[in-house]
A protein has these predicted regions:
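Beta-propeller folds
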Residues: 1-280
Length: 280
């Protein structure tokens, strides 16, 4: 059976799905184009204009009723969707429309699933002379405080984000914690930040040249300090999850006091006390 070359040249639709925290709503984002093989003839574009747009539809999983929030055409395109509660989300309009740049794309909105209570909660601005746009993203929801979420934003420092507690209805933010600043901003790689149940950062993982370093955060002093340092390819451990009571880590086989038991390529799973640096 012969397949025409067009089949191998088509870029099919790639929808994305996101379920609300309580499992009631399914959000579907997809390109507002027919799912057919339509090869863009303009080689500079590469793909059809519609491939850069995203529509947004909600399905109530209890009733299976659907509601189109945006058909995704032109300036109505959706970008940067995130849930902030069971029935509220944030998004940013798409970057372009048929006439050019969509200036609404520089604004982040919060809105209910039914379209009510839409509020501007953030604006993208160029940091003077620093060549970076301000941005905001949700990093944690607070189960004990559903009216607030933890967001990361670089509004204070262009190239490094701090953590804020934000009201999901008003967009009002309160600085919660200072983000980690690497020694070598261009050379060091900073991985994800581990946070406690209140949203405060606990630790972060950083690659510094041939070393991997775990830094911990003191919310009283708002300082980051080196907790432990490992040399590349040497025995080490990495946090998987962290709470105020301890960390779940994976890594080489250590004794409770931290002495290496066995040098091999397999990993063990431990509970780790960062205060005493003991394994259990």
């Amino acid at each position: 059976y012969e397949l025409p070359n067009e089949v191998w040249s088509c870029w099919g639709d790639t929808p994305s799905f996101s379920i609300s925290p309580n499992g009631k709503y399914l959000a579907i984002m997809r390109s507002p184009r027919e799912d057919v093989c339509d090869i863009e003839q303009d080689k500079i574009k590469g793909v059809e204009d519609e491939m850069t747009y995203q529509s947004l539809t909600f399905i109530d999983l209890e009733t299976m009723q659907s509601r189109v929030f945006s058909d995704g055409v032109g300036e109505k395109s959706i970008y940067g969707f995130q849930w902030v509660s069971d029935d509220r989300f944030i998004y940013r309009p798409g970057l372009t429309n048929a006439k050019g740049r969509n200036m609404n794309s520089l604004v982040t909105f919060a809105v209910n699933v039914d379209g009510s209570k839409r509020k501007i909660i953030g604006k993208q601005e160029m940091k003077g002379g620093q060549g970076s746009w301000t941005n905001i993203s949700v990093v944690d929801r607070l189960d004990a405080d559903p009216d607030h979420v933890i967001v990361a934003s670089n509004e204070r420092r262009a190239f490094r984000s701090d953590f804020y507690k934000m009201n999901i209805m008003t967009g009002k933010k309160k600085l919660l914690a200072i983000g980690f600043v690497p020694k070598n901003a261009k050379g060091d790689r900073v991985y994800g930040t581990y946070r406690d149940q209140e949203g405060y950062p606990i630790a972060t993982l950083v690659d510094e040249s041939l070393d991997r370093v775990i830094y911990t955060y003191d919310k009283d002093t708002q300082d980051w300090s080196e907790h432990v340092r490992f040399t590349c390819q040497q025995p080490s451990f990495t946090p998987i999850a962290a709470t105020n009571k301890g960390w779940l880590v994976t890594g080489s086989k250590f004794s409770p006091s931290g002495e290496l038991i066995e040098y091999n390529d397999t990993n063990a799973l431990y509970l780790y006390d960062p205060e005493t640096k003991e394994f259990s």
